[in-house]
């Protein structure tokens, strides 16, 4: 680590410290969302081999993009993405204007993603308990919003146990799929539009921009552990995405 990295480590502002597994779990927990539900719909419109290499390609792209995000946050003391852009990309008289434009665009993107999660989660309550959709959305929002008050460390611990349980469930489901297969591996004619749609959904389903920034802070700017977390976390997320279509 050079002198600049050491200096940035000292300035890292974090409310809690994470273990490597907690950091990996935050990546996995934040990346696996409602988008994974749409993957099988798009996967069956491609051959299984196309799905495999597309998930692998999406993994490489995701790792590169999130390493860039991690470096931006790291170089600016663990700040959020928009603030990193302000420090690294925007200069001169238009700096504030570009920063606000980025804030609005990024904020809208997050709102769309969160809205999808709320609607998807609320639909489960509707199916289970027969609640009106608005009531289910409100309940899910309150439950999801309570995570903010738990703090980053408690969130990391919760994610650790959730991901461990998810690994067990996926392992059992995968074993059952191969031991008692109901269908052969599906094939479909190649079509570029179907492949691009699958790629877009896989990248969306495994994105974890905010989690990476929390990882940078939670690991106190330890570059080796940050890289290890990103490679491993997105590897597990890609594995989950690949298993679901089976």
Where are the regions a protein language model picked out?
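Transmembrane-helix boundary/entry motifs in multi-pass membrane transporters
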Residues: 10-15, 22-23, 47-54, 68-112, ...
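Hydrophobic alpha-helical transmembrane segments of multi-pass membrane proteins
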Residues: 27, 56-57, 101-112, 139-146, ...
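Short helix-coil transition sites and intra-membrane helix breaks within transmembrane domains
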Residues: 30-32, 73-77, 111-116, 202-206
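Membrane-embedded alpha-helical segments of transport systems
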Residues: 30-34, 57-64, 104-112, 233-243
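Central hydrophobic cores of alpha-helical transmembrane segments in multi-pass inner-membrane proteins
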Residues: 34, 58-69, 141-149
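Membrane-interface helix termini and inter-helical loops of multi-pass transporters
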Residues: 39-46, 118-128, 180-191
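Helix-loop-helix junctions that connect adjacent transmembrane segments
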Residues: 134-139, 143, 153, 157-242, ...
């Amino acid at each position: 680590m050079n002198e600049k990295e050491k200096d940035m480590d000292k300035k890292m502002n974090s409310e809690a410290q994470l273990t490597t597994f907690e950091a990996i779990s935050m990546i996995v927990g934040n990346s696996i969302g409602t988008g994974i539900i749409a993957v099988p719909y798009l996967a069956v419109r491609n051959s299984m081999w196309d799905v495999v290499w597309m998930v692998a390609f999406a993994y490489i792209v995701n790792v590169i993009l999130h390493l860039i995000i991690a470096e931006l946050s790291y170089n600016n003391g663990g700040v959020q993405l928009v603030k990193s852009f302000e420090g690294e990309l925007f200069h001169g008289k238009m700096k504030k204007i570009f920063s606000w434009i980025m804030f609005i665009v990024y904020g809208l993107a997050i709102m769309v993603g969160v809205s999808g999660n709320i609607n998807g989660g609320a639909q489960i309550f509707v199916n289970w308990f027969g609640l009106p959709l608005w009531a289910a959305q409100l309940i899910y929002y309150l439950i999801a919003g309570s995570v903010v008050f738990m703090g980053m460390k408690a969130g990391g611990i919760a994610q650790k146990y959730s991901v461990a349980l998810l690994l067990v469930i996926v392992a059992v489901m995968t074993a059952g799929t191969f031991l008692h297969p109901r269908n052969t591996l599906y094939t479909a004619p190649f079509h570029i539009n179907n492949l691009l749609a699958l790629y877009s959904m896989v990248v969306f389903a495994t994105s974890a921009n905010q989690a990476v920034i929390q990882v940078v802070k939670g690991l106190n700017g330890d570059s080796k552990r940050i890289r290890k977390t990103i490679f491993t976390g997105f590897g597990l997320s890609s594995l989950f995405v690949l298993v679901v279509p089976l």
